[in-house]
């Protein structure tokens, strides 16, 4: 079986939903921007070579419905002969799309695929506009639809994750993210977007202005342990999860160009990484956040690696409680996990996140001269996902 390599990976800066800079930017336009830039970074690659576009989206309806991947591909200037599909595994959708592209390339079913993810939580709320649950599950297994915050409260209790530890983790996320932004660590992976905003001027008149959006806007530099400690529980009166130690609602998009190693050699392009393995696993929906505990051992086995082999880990911070439970249960090295902050500070644009984290981990492996990186996350409905890349 041949190798599938990532030769380009980019993302937008992450907007803070629902009132941030990307609040009026359509998801297909964000997707088009990252697809176009990802392709532009591969010298010699013609648009006609792209056989398929796979984009993940957690809430594929309304502005991000109607096979939004196809709309994004056409808006990016790809020919009508290039097919496209939108896939959904909730929070792992962006990583799932890259894994699916890699699988098709490894088996010889394709040579070049663009894969990524997109999400606008400003336009499409968590759960979508109209939630219509399965009646049988509502009656016989209501926890299947348990609010993710309450599911994470279950995880916090079961794995004995304290409020103080959650707040400390959240503070570290903001501190690390601010330092990474100041050091320009995200600059190479970020595609600047020209955004037109409508707001009021100082006289109360509506005005239109264009801004260049190129920096994640969720980081709160004034975050403190004292401030976090004052926040009230968000999901349960006696709970420990607050708005400060949970991920943010966000907008964003990311895309990667995945191709066979032979095609990369023919183009004279140096791959960023080889996509090694991907695994998913199920867990009780009422303990949704613990999913990576089951997915990580599976992907390590598939890759023939151990945790000691992994140089950098991007563990999506859906909630501090579930992140800490995963770290504690598997014995992950905190110094390898989310070294530049995570979703608590940088945001979590659902279906985009897996592709976004892939773009980030590739740069961090390069900076550290590392070999293996792992992207992992919990998934709504009671699942976990994990993927491993090898820097070349």
Predicted regions: what is each one?
Residues 1-27, 224-290, 294, 359-360, ...:
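Condensing-enzyme catalytic core mediating Claisen C-C bond formation in acyl metabolism
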Residues 11-13, 24, 28-33, 44, ...:
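N-terminal extracellular/periplasmic Venus flytrap/periplasmic-binding protein-like
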Residues 22-112, 117-135, 190-213, 286-287, ...:
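Conserved beta-ketoacyl condensing-enzyme motif
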Residues 25, 57-111, 142-153, 222-248, ...:
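Conserved catalytic cysteine-centered active-site region
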Residues 27-43, 68-72, 97, 148-155, ...:
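Short, well-ordered amphipathic alpha-helical segments that serve as non-catalytic structural scaffolds
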Residues 87-118, 156-186, 255-262, 327, ...:
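Active-site-proximal alpha-helical scaffold in enzymes
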Residues 179, 255-267, 271-277, 294-301, ...:
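Condensing-enzyme catalytic core of the thiolase-fold
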